[in-house]
Structures are given as C-alpha cells and as structure tokens.
Amino acid sequence: LDLVVIDEAGQFALADTIAVSQAAPRLLLLGDPQQLPQVSQARHPAPVQQAALDWLSDGHDTLPPELGYFLDTTYRMRPELAAVSSHLSYDDRLDANPCTAKRTLEGIEPGLHTVLVEHDRNRTTSIEEARTVLRLVVDAVGRSWVTEEGDRPLDPADVLVVAPYNAQVNLI
C-alpha cells in the first residue's frame, strides 16, 4: 500500500488518523476543517478527539497554502449565500460558480432571511419554531424552482430542514 486516503477528514479524529497512517508511507486528507465535528459520546483528552484537518489547520479558517489546497469555488450555493459563508468561515476565499446564480425560487429573494419567533423556556424543542418552519416549507413547495436544467415545481423531497437537536427534528 502506497497511499492512505481519508475522505471527510474534517470529521475524522486525529487519533484514528495517526493509527491508519501507519498502513502506508503517504497520507492524503480530504475534507473541510470547518465542517461540523464527528458525533462522539466519549470524552478524550485534547487533541485525541480533535479532527485531523482541524489539528492541521491550527486555528486557521482555511489551510495555509504550504499545507494543502483550498478549493475556492462552490457549485452548491448561490453567490449571496457563498459570500456569507466565505466571510464567516473561509477567510473570504470562497466564491460561487456563476452557474449557481441561475437557481431561483419564484417569489423568494435569494440569500439569508431571518424569521423572529417568540417563545419562552424552550430547550431541545420549540413548537413555535417547528410551526414556523412548517409554514415556510409549505409556502415554498410548489413554487417554480429554476435551475441550470430548467424549471419545475419545488417538491417536498427537495427541502431539507436541519435542526441542532434530534427532538426538534422529530417534532418538525
């Protein structure tokens, strides 16, 4: 074996990386150090549980050029979203491919939108937020979704709702 490749190294623990690196003289880490860390129930001393790419980046938002390559183009996010993500997480180095600007959802302005929801003493679930999310999804479904391939109505299967707690996901 000449090379060990670790995909999603932004979620692969440093200890595991060191262990598998013994299998070959060369190691290639692929992934995003800004990605959410792996889920772990155990507690280990630092930096054992730290992700390999996080350890390698040593606090930088992006890897310094001498340590690796930064893929500076996203094909997933429109420019409005990529600019925010780039500023917050990628040292303003991330750009959206022009093809992403063609993606539109009829009647909804591209970008980030804040919806304030009043509630009190919620912890891992919020019925108020769940109702708001459901209302927004129902409103979006059926609208004209335009992509590089053409346009069609937005389908419920096109929508992904992410929440920080499984209890909230189940509620939604």
What kind of region is each of these model predictions?
Residues L1-I172:
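Conserved helicase motor core of SF1/SF2 NTP-dependent helicases
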